[in-house]
Structures are given as C-alpha cells and as structure tokens.
Amino acid sequence: MKTLVLLSALVLPCFQVQADPIQNTDEETKTEEQPEEEDQAVSVSFGGTEGSALQDVAQRRFPWCRKCRVCQKCQVCQKCPVCPTCPQCPKQPLCEERQNKTAITTQAPNTQHKGC
C-alpha cells in the first residue's frame, strides 16, 4: 500500500506536466515583467528601545563583552568602550594605578580607584 502511494505521488506530476504544457503568451509575460507596487522593501524590528529579554538573559549567563571577552561583574575600570573590565580578571593587564593600589592596599585600604 505504501509503495502504491509513493509510486502514484511520483507518477502523477509527470502526467500533469505532459498533459498541460507551459505556454507563455505575450500578455502573461508583460504582466509578469511589470513591477508591482507591493514589491517594496519593508523593515521589521522585534526589539524595543529597552532591549529584549533574551539579551538580558544572555548577559546574565555570559557576563562579559562579546567583543573583548572580559568580565562585566566589576565596573570600576573602563578599558573597553563597549564594556567595563574587571580588575580581578587575569586576562587583562592591570593599569599602573591599579597595580599601585594592590601594592598599597595593606597600607591604605580606603583608597579609591579613579579609572584607567
């Protein structure tokens, strides 16, 4: 039964093509060549100005910038124009002020880091 259905599904289009040959008349080709008013470029946006929930979830799951791959948990030091870098991140070299702060931390624990 399955082979009969499959065979008929393959043979039926062949018979339809032979029975109804495609003939283009001058009127059909003229109407097909004319551009319609419906063929216009349309811009569709699914996000708002506040961002989407998927982006928020992605930022919580991967808390680093996709461009520079650094941590966004600590927002003290601004090295990347896209995202803040984490001073504890081993991938990023520390600026001179941050190095001095880590060296002086035992002497003056209330020192604030002003940025790089």
From Swiss-Prot:
One of its GO terms (cellular component) is extracellular space. Small bowel. Residues 22-44 are annotated as: Disordered. Sequence repeats lie at residues 65-67, 68-70, 71-73, 74-76, 77-79, 80-82, 83-85, 86-88, 89-91. Residues 80-91 are annotated as: 4 X 3 AA tandem repeats of C-P-X. Residues 1-19 form the signal peptide. Residues 65-70 are annotated as: 2 X 3 AA tandem repeats of C-R-X. Residues 20-60 form a propeptide. It holds the Pfam family Defensin_propep. It is found in: Secreted. Its main location: secreted. Residues 71-79 are annotated as: 3 X 3 AA tandem repeats of C-Q-X. The keyword Secreted applies. The keyword Heme does not apply. Keywords: Antimicrobial, Defensin, Repeat, Secreted, Signal. One of its GO terms (biological process) is defense response to bacterium. Belongs to the alpha-defensin family. Apparent precursor of a secreted, cationic, proline- and cysteine-rich peptide that contains Cys-Pro-Xaa repeats. Unlike cryptdin, the proposed mature peptide region lacks the structural motif characteristic of defensins. This is Alpha-defensin 29. It comes from Mus musculus. The gene is Defa29.
